[in-house]
Amino acid sequence: MAKTYDYLFKLLLIGDSGVGKTCVLFRFSEDAFNSTFISTIGIDFKIRTIELDGKRIKLQIWDTAGQERFRTITTAYYRGAMGIMLVYDITNEKSFDNIRNWIRNIEEHASADVEKMILGNKCDVNDKRQVSKERGEKLALDYGIKFMETSAKANINVENAFFTLARDIKAKMDKKLEGNSPQGSNQGVKITPDQQKRSSFFRCVLL
């Protein structure tokens, strides 16, 4: 049977329990919202195929449990991930503070050149906000990664976040393919052009 896609990208959603990872995933994969999801047990995944630059990209998106007791299971899935979304809840200060711990997990268990993005979820609940957008932006800048505020409930920026991450992964892959020589393959993941790309993103998105 012929393949129905040109690329397969494995993505991972990580963050504390209750920040809305499952809701973000369902909004993107099913265009649906359910406020009564129970906490993910272990790990689950959804698939959605999107089109970018005339190519069909199959996104396999893994939703991980945020509880400490599942940490050993979920970190095993970091290794093959090409993109990781770190999710916190803007109404929960602790979930934001823990993003640094989640980044340490990525550094320990994931590929060195994995694409990352921080999502401040539940931005529709502004009256209960504990974490300002500026703090989210600063944290992302500290680590040199992208940031967006999202709402699975109000369908704000969810689609944009996944498409942006997929586009960055594809750009990195294309760059590696272009430089298929021994020197070129290493240069495909140079830090400098990536940082330039990120800085231009912030000028456009974080206004």
From Swiss-Prot:
Q: Which Pfam families match?
A: Ras
Listed Gene3D superfamilies: P-loop containing nucleotide triphosphate hydrolases (3.40.50.300)
* Sequence positions bearing Phosphoserine: 181, 185
Q: How is it modified after translation?
A: Phosphorylation of Thr-72 in the switch II region by LRRK2 prevents the association of RAB regulatory proteins, including CHM, CHML and RAB GDP dissociation inhibitors GDI1 and GDI2. Phosphorylation by LRRK2 is required for localization to stressed lysosomes.
Note the InterPro entries from the entry.
Answer: P-loop_NTPase, Small_GTP-bd, Small_GTPase, Small_GTPase_Rab
Give the binding site residues for Mg(2+): 22, 40, 63
Enzyme kind, highest EC tier: hydrolase
Q: Which residues carry this modification: Phosphothreonine?
A: 72
Q: Which cellular component terms (GO) are annotated to the entry?
A: actin cytoskeleton; centriolar satellite; centriole; centrosome; ciliary basal body; ciliary base; ciliary membrane; cilium
Positions modified as Cysteine methyl ester? 204
Q: Which reaction does it catalyse?
A: GTP + H2O = GDP + phosphate + H(+)
**Annotated membrane topology:** Lipid-anchor
Proregion residues are 205-207
Task: Specify where it is mainly localized.
Answer: membrane
Q: Which cofactor does it need?
A: Mg(2+)
- Per UniProt, what is one GO molecular function of this protein? GTP binding
Q: Where is the lipid attached (S-geranylgeranyl cysteine)?
A: 204
Keyword field: Autophagy, Cell membrane, Cell projection, Cilium, Cilium biogenesis/degradation, Cytoplasm, Cytoplasmic vesicle, Cytoskeleton, Endosome, Golgi apparatus, GTP-binding, Hydrolase, Lipoprotein, Lysosome, Membrane, Methylation, Nucleotide-binding, Phosphoprotein, Prenylation, Protein transport, Proto-oncogene, Transport
NCBIfam families, sorted: small_GTP
Family assignment from sequence similarity: Belongs to the small GTPase superfamily. Rab family.
Tell me the domain comment.
Answer: Switch 1, switch 2 and the interswitch regions are characteristic of Rab GTPases and mediate the interactions with Rab downstream effectors. The switch regions undergo conformational changes upon nucleotide binding which drives interaction with specific sets of effector proteins, with most effectors only binding to GTP-bound Rab.
Q: How does it assemble?
A: Interacts (GTP-bound form) with MICALL1; regulates RAB8A association with recycling endosomes. Interacts with MICALL2; competes with RAB13 and is involved in E-cadherin endocytic recycling. Interacts (GTP-bound form) with MICAL1, MICALCL, MICAL3, EHBP1 and EHBP1L1; at least in case of MICAL1, MICALCL, MICAL3 and EHBP1L1 two molecules of RAB8A can bind to one molecule of the effector protein; ternary complexes of RAB8A, RAB13 and either MICAL1 or EHBP1L1 are possible. Interacts with EHD1. Interacts with MAP4K2 and SYTL4. Interacts with SGSM1 and SGSM3.
Protein known as? Ras-related protein Rab-8A
What organism is listed for this UniProt entry?
Answer: Homo sapiens (Human)
Top-level taxonomy: Eukaryota, Metazoa, Chordata, Craniata, Vertebrata
